[in-house]
């Protein structure tokens, strides 16, 4: 075994090897010069940041800061990733050269490294076309859901979306879809990752993206897909006459992202007057100048300009998409003059109720219920389960993330079942199963029709949400996170929970709250199952433990796949008829405080709480 100082040398030697290779292969003058400069300055610290480890290709693809080096998103790492993905697809699909793939992109850009989503998309297209594979490359920015829609609609082998969704401005990402129109799940991520490692040296034509413009293999699907998407969306318009007459006014923000024109078109498809757009945020801007984080999930801070415009135009409802328009936040002005931002779970309850109610009106035959499904992820509210139990349709829970819901929805559809709706608490909604992923464009217009319909009954969204809780039982939720940049600390925290009451003994209580069941999807343990084995798939690479409490509370602690966060989700579910939400809220707050104090132990592990 090498001496400790030898390991330092080993790292330096590896760094030298990586940078030398980079200088041979990189043809982007900005990133190439940046690396040369760091070498000349002997800036080992910065070089380690850029070359420390290759970005890991997971089921969510890639997501990292743009800049030079194998740890970052740039021209060379995009070429390398795409070469690996291309070789993997060639192995998986014998008809790849007949069917082809789709590629689209958002509006992100990083001038200092010459990187942008559009450029990355063109380089990815160049890689596939150089191998004789047809590429449907959008000529302009689109929402992320347009990629899975195109895969399904044109029956392609795969899709790539270049986006970092609602991440900070310096980031970008590479998200992939399989031929079933859903995000990839394991083992494809491992296979792609291995293929990338085997195809690192750029192929002869990799850098020359000018070649693709004259290639017969390049197709621009923009016009036809735009048309077909909105034609399909029209099938989910249930009250066209109400929409034409409605007096409800809407404000929309695309938070400097891609959503503006698509949401305008969606409203027109539903015969709704298009929403008033927040002028400072409607056009794509990779600098995101008006917000600290371009994420509507962060709540009121992102919506300040929307509220100001809504107050000015007397609009009662604000619709906010994240920058790649796959998520949606909704806020409603209350009689008190305050704005209420609905949580992802609350909007999930409203949309689930609405899509079931609308479906039921068109399908009077009760026997159809046995083939009708709704899905949500294991960290989302169980409100759909409560509605399903009472109404007679099926509810299924999946692991966290739309990759699981999209793949499960496709399985059910292939079995002849109807999937009405799927959602996750992180403001992601699949209202129309022609897109097997979250879609903020369809969710925005369906929310607008719901609000317009309720207005004819003199009801607000808030009043209808209360009616849902009264009928099906209150579901009170609370979610937040702690920030932790150290993987070892995160591991220690979760290992402490697994050995809380002595070796291999999980906690029996959290403060005064007794625990009745524990499911650990990192290890595959579930003590509510007869064989103590979890039914849902397990993953050793991520931490996730769910505690069920004797008082009807459920809390999940898990790591984030894309951010340095340990998240928690807690919910109290009451049976129908329990109409004291304030008491439930008080109890839930006490439970959350106990979890933070006893299970997170922020002082011990030096965790930073979420900033208000």
From Swiss-Prot:
The active site is at residue 165. The keyword DNA repair does not apply. Alpha-D-glucose 1,6-bisphosphate binds at residues 63, 165, 326-327, 400, 424, 438. Its main location: cytoplasm. Pfam families: PGM_PMM_I, PGM_PMM_II, PGM_PMM_III. Disulfide bonds: none annotated. Keywords: Acetylation, Carbohydrate metabolism, Cytoplasm, Glucose metabolism, Isomerase, Magnesium, Metal-binding, Phosphoprotein. Mg(2+) binds at residues 165, 322, 324, 326. Its cofactor is Mg(2+). One of its GO terms (molecular function) is phosphoglucomutase activity. It is found in: Cytoplasm, Cytosol. The modification Phosphoserine is found at residue 165. It catalyses: alpha-D-ribose 1-phosphate = D-ribose 5-phosphate; 2-deoxy-alpha-D-ribose 1-phosphate = 2-deoxy-D-ribose 5-phosphate; alpha-D-glucose 1-phosphate = alpha-D-glucose 6-phosphate; O-phospho-L-seryl-[protein] + alpha-D-glucose 1-phosphate = alpha-D-glucose 1,6-bisphosphate + L-seryl-[protein]. SUPFAM superfamilies: Phosphoglucomutase, C-terminal domain, Phosphoglucomutase, first 3 domains. The phosphomutase activity is stimulated by glucose 1,6-bisphosphate. CDD domains: PGM2 (cd05799). One of its GO terms (biological process) is glycogen catabolic process. The keyword Cell division does not apply. The modification N-acetylalanine is found at residue 2. GO terms for cellular component: cytosol; extracellular exosome; extracellular region; ficolin-1-rich granule lumen; secretory granule lumen. Its EC number is 5.4.2.7, 5.4.2.2. It comes from the Eukaryota. Catalyzes the conversion of the nucleoside breakdown products ribose-1-phosphate and deoxyribose-1-phosphate to the corresponding 5-phosphopentoses. Catalyzes the reversible isomerization of alpha-D-glucose 1-phosphate to alpha-D-glucose 6-phosphate but with a lower catalytic efficiency. The mechanism proceeds via the intermediate compound alpha-D-glucose 1,6-bisphosphate. In vitro, also has a low glucose 1,6-bisphosphate synthase activity which is most probably not physiologically relevant. Monomer. Belongs to the phosphohexose mutase family. This is Phosphopentomutase.
């Amino acid at each position: 075994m090498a001496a400790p100082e030898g390991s330092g040398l080993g790292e330096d030697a590896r760094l030298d090897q990586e940078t030398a290779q980079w200088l041979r292969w990189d043809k982007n003058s900005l990133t190439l010069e940046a690396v040369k400069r760091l070498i000349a300055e002997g800036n080992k610290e910065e070089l380690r940041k850029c070359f420390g480890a290759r970005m890991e290709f997971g089921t969510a693809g890639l997501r990292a800061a743009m800049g030079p080096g194998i740890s970052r998103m740039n021209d060379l790492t995009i070429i390398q990733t795409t070469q690996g993905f291309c070789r993997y697809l060639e192995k998986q699909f014998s008809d790849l050269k007949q069917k082809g793939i789709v590629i689209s992109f958002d509006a992100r850009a990083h001038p200092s490294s010459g990187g942008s989503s559009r450029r990355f998309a063109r380089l990815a297209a160049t890689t596939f076309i150089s191998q004789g594979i047809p590429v449907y490359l959008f000529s302009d920015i689109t929402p992320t859901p347009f990629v899975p829609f195109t895969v399904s609609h044109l029956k392609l082998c795969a899709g790539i979306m270049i986006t970092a969704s609602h991440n900070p401005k310096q980031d970008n990402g590479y998200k992939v879809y399989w031929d079933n129109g859903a995000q990839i799940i394991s083992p494809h991520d491992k296979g792609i990752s291995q293929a990338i490692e085997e195809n690192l040296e750029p192929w002869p034509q990799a850098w020359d993206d000018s070649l693709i413009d004259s290639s017969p293999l390049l197709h621009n699907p923009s016009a036809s897909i735009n048309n077909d998407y909105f034609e399909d969306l029209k099938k989910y318009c249930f009250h066209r006459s109400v929409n034409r007459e409605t007096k409800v006014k809407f404000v929309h923000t695309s938070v400097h992202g891609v959503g503006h024109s698509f949401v305008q078109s969606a409203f027109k498809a539903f015969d709704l007057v298009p929403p008033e757009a927040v002028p400072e945020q409607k056009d794509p801007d990779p600098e995101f100048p008006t917000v600290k984080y371009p994420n509507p999930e962060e709540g009121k801070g992102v919506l300040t300009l929307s509220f100001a415009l809504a107050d000015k135009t007397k609009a009662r409802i604000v619709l906010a998409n994240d920058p790649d328009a796959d998520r949606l936040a909704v806020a409603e002005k209350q009689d008190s003059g305050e704005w209420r931002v609905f949580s992802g779970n609350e909007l999930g309850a409203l949309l689930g109720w609405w899509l079931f109610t609308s479906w039921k009106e068109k399908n009077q035959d009760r026997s159809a219920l046995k083939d009708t499904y709704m899905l949500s992820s294991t960290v989302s509210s169980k409100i759909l389960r409560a509605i399903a139990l009472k109404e007679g349709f099926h509810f299924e829970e999946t692991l966290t993330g739309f990759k699981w819901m999209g793949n499960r929805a496709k399985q059910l559809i292939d079995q002849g079942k109807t999937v009405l709706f799927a959602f996750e608490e992180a403001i992601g909604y699949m209202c129309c199963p022609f897109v097997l992923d979250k879609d903020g464009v369809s969710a925005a217009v369906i929310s607008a029709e719901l609000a317009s319909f309720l207005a004819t009954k003199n009801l607000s969204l808030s009043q209808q949400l209360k009616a849902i809780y009264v009928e099906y039982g209150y579901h009170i939720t609370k979610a937040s996170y702690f920030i932790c940049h150290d993987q070892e600390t995160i591991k220690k925290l979760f290992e402490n929970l697994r050995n809380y009451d002595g070796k291999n003994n999980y906690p029996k209580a959290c403060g005064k709250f007794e625990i009745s069941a524990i499911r650990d999807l990192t290890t595959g343990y579930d003590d509510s199952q007869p064989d103590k084995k979890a039914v849902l798939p397990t993953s050793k690479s991520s931490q996730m433990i769910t505690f069920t409490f004797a008082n009807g509370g459920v809390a999940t602690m898990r790591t984030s796949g894309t951010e340095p966060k340990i998240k928690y989700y807690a919910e109290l579910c009451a049976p129908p008829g329990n109409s004291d939400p304030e008491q439930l809220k008080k109890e839930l707050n006490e439970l959350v405080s106990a979890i933070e104090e006893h299970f997170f132990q922020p002082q011990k592990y030096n965790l930073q709480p979420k900033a208000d």
